[in-house]
Amino acid sequence: MTVEMTDEENIWGSDNEASTGPQESLEVKKLQQIHSKRGYLDGISSAKEENLQAGFDDTFPLGAKYGFQIGEIVGKLRLFTTLYGNADPQVAADLKQAQDELRINRVLSARHFDEELQPLDSLKVLLSKWQARVLDYEGKYS
């Protein structure tokens, strides 16, 4: 099926048919390439944004859950360090180690999740280790 365009519909056409020399053709082709590329890139960007938003919506609750648990662990260790750090230097050492091991870019890295973004046992082991350590300090200082 061939679609015929009128002169009014042809946005790439010239207003002055007599001036369709080689220079104008190159300019029109270059303009067509620029607009085509821009349209292509806009389409790619739009698709990426939609997929990124969907991924964010799906995984935010999981990230928030782990962020809360990590915040609780580090917060309690910081409290124990403030209250008992002078008498028990191990508390301060544990706080420093926990802050290193539980940094968000380490916890939410690909090594702790499968292809469906479900947590692997390595993440559960890491969090359990620090939760147990906090429980030990709670028992010791309560």
UniProtKB/Swiss-Prot annotation:
Pfam annotation, one family: Yae1_N
Biased composition (Acidic residues): 1-10
GO biological process terms, semicolon-separated: protein maturation
Cellular compartments per GO CC: cytoplasm; nucleus
Major localization listed first in the record, in broad terms: cytoplasm
Chain residue ranges for the region called Disordered: 1-24
Keywords: Cytoplasm, Nucleus
Keyword Cytoplasm: yes
Region spans: deca-GX3 motif: 39-79
Cellular location(s): Cytoplasm; Nucleus
Top-rank lineage group of the source organism: Eukaryota
Protein's job: The complex LTO1:YAE1 may function as a target specific adapter that probably recruits apo-RPLI1 to the cytosolic iron-sulfur protein assembly (CIA) complex machinery. May be required for biogenesis of the large ribosomal subunit and initiation of translation.
Family designation: Belongs to the YAE1 family.
Oligomer status and interactors: May form a complex with LTO1.
Name this protein carries in UniProt: Protein YAE1
Organism: Kluyveromyces lactis (strain ATCC 8585 / CBS 2359 / DSM 70799 / NBRC 1267 / NRRL Y-1140 / WM37) (Yeast)
Encoding gene per record: YAE1
